[in-house]
Amino acid sequence: LAGLRAIPNLNVFRPADARETQAAWYLAVTSEKTPTALVLTRQNLTVEEGTDFDKVAKGAYVVYENAADFDTILIATGSEVNLAVAAAKELEAQGEKVRVVSVPSTDIFDVQDAAYKEEILPNAVRRRVAIEMAATQSWYKYVGLDGAVIGIDKFGASAPAAKVMEEYGFTVARVIEVVKNLK
């Protein structure tokens, strides 16, 4: 995934669900300027209530928010968007104010104007956690010096999916722990 993102002029999409996949496919087949890579999962994912076909064209957008005065941003892509929303709902139950941003394409988000980037990832909110089941290096530009990234920076493991996800910290409990440690 990091290798694909490093290729100049290649739009890489890692959609969160069927709705984002439809949008990514549409953008791929209608693109006249750049090739596209769709990175899909074999997981059986639910369609998130907040995913939006039209907003995929911006590369990143708010998929969940429980308060206008949020102080935490969870940034996720692909199947991890489901995890981020589940963690946000649990954090909400604990009194936290959280925004979840789905990032189906870092390439497309990175070329948006500064005003849109600020709307999605306001500089004033520095408590940020990015979540992706891949190398972490793509995410530090979004979480900044005060944030954290939950990812995989070692060679993969082989086991049933649930066991691997737990081993690498892709659980609601781990996301909450990382968020709480940022306070």
Model-found features: residue ranges?
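Conserved thiamine diphosphate
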Residues: L1-S31, T171, I176-V178
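Thiamine diphosphate
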Residues: T21, T30-K183
